[in-house]
Every structure is written in C-alpha cells, then in structure tokens.
Amino acid sequence: MLKKKPVSFSCIDGHIYKIFPNDLNANNTVFGGLLMSLLDRLALVVAERHTESVCVTAFVDALRFYAPAYMGENLICKAAVNRTWRTSLEVGVKVWAENIYKQERRHITSAYFTFVAVNEDNQPIPVHQIVPETPEEKRRYNEADRRRQARLELK
C-alpha cells in the first residue's frame, strides 16, 4: 500500500566524509568523480529509504562544481527527496567543504538525481508520495516539477 511520507522520513543531513590523499586529483583538490559517486550514493540511500524498494539512477540534472575541496577538509552532505511522481522521484544533494582549522564552510557542489523504483524484474513500480511541510520543502517540490517538465520537453 502506498503511503504519504514527510521529507524528514528519508533525508540525510550532516553526513561527513573526511578527505584523504587518495581522494585527490593531480591538482591536489578532491577528484570530481569521487564527488559524483558520493552524491549518487547518498541520493540512492534517500531514494531507497523513501520508496522502500530498489531504485536506479535515471537522470542527473544540474550537477555543478562551485569550488574545490582540499586534503584534510570535511565534506558535509545533505540529501532529501524533492518530489515524487508515479514511479520516479527527484532527490537533491548539496555538499559543503568544511575547514575546521579556519572555521570556514563553503558550498562546493549540488545536483538533482532522478531515480526510478523497480521490482525484482527491473520493472518500474509506483512510489510513495512525498509530503512537503516547510516553506523550503514546498519550494523544492515546485522547482522539481519545473525541472521535470523541462526534461520532458527535451525528448
């Protein structure tokens, strides 16, 4: 039976990833591919918590790198369901780099991931509805639908 769930049911807020030397590229900044993988994994956890089923990544929208992150910094991550449709949902992910020695935090990357919930035969299945409660959640809910409409127009 499909349910209505609040954003808080499945969100991740404050996940921390410590940057070590093996996370760096040739410029001694965090490797972009590592960030992309981290974002996809966090978004997947949120999607599967919400749907209570296996989900597959269908689309990545607006993935942007705003600033570099460096060795020794912490990556602070937030991910939440923005909107659900019949068999899919959008999860927004945002990451900040934290330098605890300088007492600074800066936004380094964000993205929107669309997932499709699937059954054991890899066929799409209906997902639970999301219930936005706060003004911020309602804003993200509406913006997610605009992004989806823009994607559908590109087809």
UniProtKB/Swiss-Prot annotation:
Keywords linked to the UniProt accession = Hydrolase
Pfam families assigned: 4HBT
Q: Where is the HotDog ACOT-type domain?
A: 9-121
Instruction: Spell out the InterPro entries in the cross-references.
Output: Cytosol_ACT (IPR040170), HOTDOG_ACOT (IPR033120), HotDog_dom_sf (IPR029069), Thioestr_dom (IPR006683)
Highest taxon of source: Bacteria
Q: What EC number(s) does this enzyme carry?
A: 3.1.2.-
**Top EC class of this enzyme:** hydrolase
- Which GO terms are recorded in the biological process aspect for this UniProt protein? acyl-CoA metabolic process
The cellular component terms of Gene Ontology attached to this UniProt record, alphabetical and capped at eight, are: cytosol
The GO terms this record gives for MF are:
long-chain fatty acyl-CoA hydrolase activity
Concerning PANTHER family, the annotation shows: ACYL COENZYME A THIOESTER HYDROLASE, PROTEIN VDLD
User: In which family does this protein belong, per the annotation?
Assistant: Belongs to the acyl coenzyme A hydrolase family.
- Record protein name field: Uncharacterized acyl-CoA thioester hydrolase CPn_0654/CP_0093/CPj0654/CpB0680
List the lineage, top down.
Bacteria, Pseudomonadati, Chlamydiota, Chlamydiia, Chlamydiales
